[in-house]
Amino acid sequence: MKIELWGVRGSLPTPLTNNEYQLRVRSIIETALTNSSSKTSIDDIIKLLPSHVSTLYGGNTTCVTVKSRKGNLAILDAGTGLRPLGDQLITEEAGEGKLTANFFFTHTHWDHIQGLPFFKPLYIKGNKFIFNSPIRDLHERLNYQQKFKFFPREFDDTDSVKEFNQLKLNESFTIDDSLIVDFIPLRHPGGSFAYRFREGEKSFIFSTDVEFRGNAVESFTSDHGDFFCSADLLILDSQYTLDEAFAKFDWGHTSYSMAVNCGINWKVKKLVLTHHEPSYSDEKLSSIYSDAQEHMNASAKAAQIEVPELFLATEGMVFDI
């Protein structure tokens, strides 16, 4: 499986501000002046930059793709990250009306569906999309978002073929006899779902918009531990710091420290922290990643156990498992 991240922000899109951009430019110039010599290359300077300057984590809301070994495409959620995905797809078979893809929706809060009206392949005749979710009225919800009073082109009037499939708990959904999909419900206002994708012996879990806290993790693990256990890759909600998670109790999101605990307890191989808080700058996200790595290492040392490889979700990040 090839997993690619197209949108990693939570709640609402977060463009880089002019002030943040100027601070980056200042940092780059200062680093260049401090380390300049006739033998110093541009690449050398870039390597010296702090991660929050050299990397743009991304401001688009949630969208992730899974591509199977057979080339089948699954699209997880339709935040604003769906727009650049669509721009890429129309340079390929979608531009000729030859794309078939499966959507899977965790839930329909705006940051997980707001990119759909701007998904260009949706408007091209011949393309086919299967919309999968446990949500009974998913079609109605997506159609309502594009009512003429809100958007100039209604969802049902787009030119692609659209099919809807309601998933059932404890019943696996299979794509082309190779990619097996399961789901479980999560704790989040209005409800949400985690998806597990399996191909051969490999497994990937997408679990955004969930509030794991305290002893609830133990009870959840006892009920659903097999779902998460030993995944090759887990992308998990980690929107808040621990202090902010306490201040926003019942808002439906997890702290980065609790996300790390979950990854360790479930013995996953790779853990990706995602659904970044929109008010957090890239500098703060870099700091959170460092703190999460420190927490991970301390846990490993204290318990003498193997821990997951840790990543901070970044637009354009790709995993091959």
Task: Kindly give the residue locations of the regions a language model identified.
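Binuclear metal-dependent hydrolase catalytic cores
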Residues: M1-I205, G214-N215, G225-D226, D282-I321
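Cap/insert and terminal regions of metallo-dependent hydrolase folds
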Residues: S203, R213-P308
